[in-house]
Amino acid sequence: PLPRAVIRQLVACAGDAGKTVALRACGSEQELLDALRVAGQARMEIALIDPGSCVDSARLHRVLRDLPYPYVETHDDSVDRPERCLPNGLGHCIATVRGYCAQSYLLGLEIALEHLGCTEIQGDVHVGT
């Protein structure tokens, strides 16, 4: 699970941009697939996805190809212990963020918010255009 401090930062960063963030820790492939489906029904604007051990899942690949919203692939790995990433070309992946441990989620959110046109972000990191 994400450290509480990171969760607070995610919520604050989204709030500063006038957005809300829904956090969901998925314990299985099916939970991840269900969360993506529900997000689509809720008209999610964008998602941060950490595929974890599901990077090779054919079911996840199919769902990502058909997502009605873009996503940022995010990993909480470190530079010296990189996790495997999803294959290229799965839906509308606007970026992959990895190597910054839990801070990767904050960087991913900053990228997502910039993609949505939220350029007045109050965070410490600017991901640039």
Question: Model-found features: residue ranges?
Answer:
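Short, glycine-/small-residue-rich phosphate/pyrophosphate-handling segment
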Residues: 5, 12, 80-129
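Short, acidic/small-residue loops that bind anionic groups at enzyme active sites
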Residues: 66-82
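Short, structured coil segments at secondary-structure junctions
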Residues: 17, 67, 89-92
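Short beta->alpha junction loops
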Residues: 20-31
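Short Gly/Thr/Asp-enriched flexible loops that form oxyanion-binding sites at enzyme active sites
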Residues: 35-38, 49-69
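Short helix-loop-beta junction
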Residues: 9-20
